[in-house]
Amino acid sequence: MEIDYYDYEKLLEKAYEELPENVKHHKSRFEVPGALVTIEGNKTIIENFKDIAEALNRDPQHLLKFLLREIATAGTLEGKRVVLQGRFTPYLIANKLKKYIKEYVICPVCGSPDTKIIKRDRFYFLKCEACGAETPIQHL
């Protein structure tokens, strides 16, 4: 069976019209601000923590909980920044943020960053707003 090229174009246009507005006009590039890390004595401060959480479209508490578990330390959210107990390199913080993005932000099906975390019964899912896929994720 041969598919007519013009029928394909019409179907493609129709599919595009069905997409949600936030998907049609999203930025082609996903940009997250780099962590501004300062070390003061035995504390590490991420100055722009809230900005990072907003760029990822995630609750700062969720991101903080992940970060604290990953680097096995205590920390607090103070306004727009986070204060961590201990000295941690900017490289380590950046790697942990990349891991968070891979596990809790980017859709594993289509690669879109337009996702949200939803809870159904006792389980958590990463729901993609671009392709509609729901992927189970580990609860923090």
Swiss-Prot record:
Species whose genome carries this gene: Pyrococcus horikoshii (strain ATCC 700860 / DSM 12428 / JCM 9974 / NBRC 100139 / OT-3)
Example of a GO MF term: translation initiation factor activity
A Pfam family per the record: eIF-5_eIF-2B
Family: Belongs to the eIF-2-beta/eIF-5 family.
Matches recorded under NCBIfam families: aIF-2beta (TIGR00311), PRK03988.1 (NF003067)
The protein's role, per its UniProt record: eIF-2 functions in the early steps of protein synthesis by forming a ternary complex with GTP and initiator tRNA.
Protein name: Translation initiation factor 2 subunit beta
Listed SMART domains: eIF2B_5
Description of how the protein assembles with itself and partners: Heterotrimer composed of an alpha, a beta and a gamma chain.
Keywords on record: Initiation factor, Protein biosynthesis
Entry superkingdom: Archaea
InterPro entries documented for this protein: IF2/IF5 (IPR045196), TIF2_bsu_arc (IPR004458), Transl_init_fac_IF2/IF5_dom (IPR002735), Transl_init_fac_IF2/IF5_N (IPR016189), Transl_init_fac_IF2/IF5_Zn-bd (IPR016190)
Keyword Flavoprotein tagged: no
